[in-house]
Swiss-Prot record:
Reactions that this protein is recorded to catalyse: catechol + O2 = (2Z,4E)-2-hydroxy-6-oxohexa-2,4-dienoate + H(+)
GO biological process: toluene catabolic process
A molecular-function term among this protein's GO annotations: ferrous iron binding
Cofactor names: Fe(2+)
Protein name: Metapyrocatechase
Pfam families (UniProt xref): Diox-like_N, Glyoxalase
Alphabetized UniProt keyword annotations: Aromatic hydrocarbons catabolism, Dioxygenase, Iron, Metal-binding, Oxidoreductase, Plasmid, Repeat
Organism: Pseudomonas putida
């Protein structure tokens, strides 16, 4: 059931060296720097995104994710979701408007998996970067690098998947698009969506709470993905796997690392969902094919390197 949560809105990542991180996210991924704040955080967006930022970088001593935020339809929905979270037993933290530049008040909570999420209703609307709202051209001419289209999703590793599933489906209004079941029928991976997308956030069982596997950015075509692979090679960027295809979601994909060790994905294509679609199920005996559809062999680094 729709509870008013619209889409992924932003993610804040910790990076070890801001200048190297910006070279990666701006020059290689093609994000646009939009702002900086007095804490030293840098705000970035992809060119099609209409709000001011979707990625916040914070310099720190270790990499990883501070939090992921979802935008809700309006303040009334935010107040109701806040009440629902508290009624469900979640401790919520109020973050005032302006704590993130150009963003309204946020309601933060911790999922049973150990990850921090937040909800907000307002963020400065800047429109698509480099385009007018009236009679727009197809794309801006001066995009850099991969010219990432949007921040799309994040994949988390943590424990307590059933409780996390209940929170996201019963309180926040997500639905299960795809899953992986072990030989006992226990769900060990869950791909959750708010929309027709293959997923907006995903969780994989891991004994340690609160770990990040990757943040993902959308590209338009397979040719864009191959060009992204060329740019990864040209810049000697550390690559994990790809270009290849997932069995899960059927998206075409490349995984690589930012200079701090945070894993990034760029992808195109993939499945779509409507309310009458049943969840797609994979079994762990086919996990190699589910993750890497062509090779059908698990990459140990892909499964174990987390931030």
């Amino acid at each position: 059931m729709n509870k008013g949560v619209m889409r992924p809105g932003h993610v804040q990542l910790r990076v070890l060296d801001m200048s190297k991180a910006l070279e990666h996210y701006v020059e290689l991924l093609g994000l646009i720097e939009m702002d900086r704040d007095d804490q030293g955080r840098v705000y970035l967006k992809a060119w099609t995104e209409v709000d001011k930022f979707s990625l916040v970088l914070r310099e720190a001593d270790e990499p990883g994710m501070d939090f992921m935020g979802f935008k809700v339809v309006d303040e009334d929905a935010l107040r109701q979701l806040e009440r629902d979270l508290m009624a469900y037993g979640c401790a919520v933290e109020q973050l005032p408007a302006g704590e993130l530049n150009s963003c309204g008040r946020r309601v933060r909570f911790q999922a049973p998996s150990g990850h921090h999420f937040e909800l907000y209703a307002d963020k400065e609307y800047t429109g698509k970067w480099g385009l007018n709202d009236v009679n727009p051209e197809a794309w801006p001419r001066d995009l850099k690098g991969m010219a990432a289209v949007r921040f799309d999703h994040a994949l988390m590793y943590g424990d307590e998947l059933p409780a996390t599933y209940d929170l996201f489906t019963k309180v926040l209004g997500f639905y299960l698009a795809e899953q992986v079941l072990d030989e006992n029928g226990t769900r060990v991976a869950q791909f959750l969506s708010l929309s027709t997308k293959a997923h907006d956030v995903a969780f994989i069982h891991h004994p340690e709470k609160g770990r990040l596997h990757h943040v993902s950015f959308h590209l338009e075509t397979w040719e864009d993905l191959l060009r992204a692979a060329d740019l990864i090679s040209m810049t000697d960027t550390s690559i994990d796997i790809g270009p290849t295809r997932h069995g899960l979601t059927h998206g075409k994909t490349i995984y690589f690392f930012d200079p701090s060790g945070n894993r990034n994905e760029v992808f195109c294509g993939g499945d779509y969902n409507y309310p009458d679609h049943k969840p797609v199920t994979w079994t762990t005996d086919q996990l190699g094919k589910a993750i890497f559809y062509h090779d059908r062999i698990l990459n140990e680094r892909f499964m174990t390197v987390l931030t």
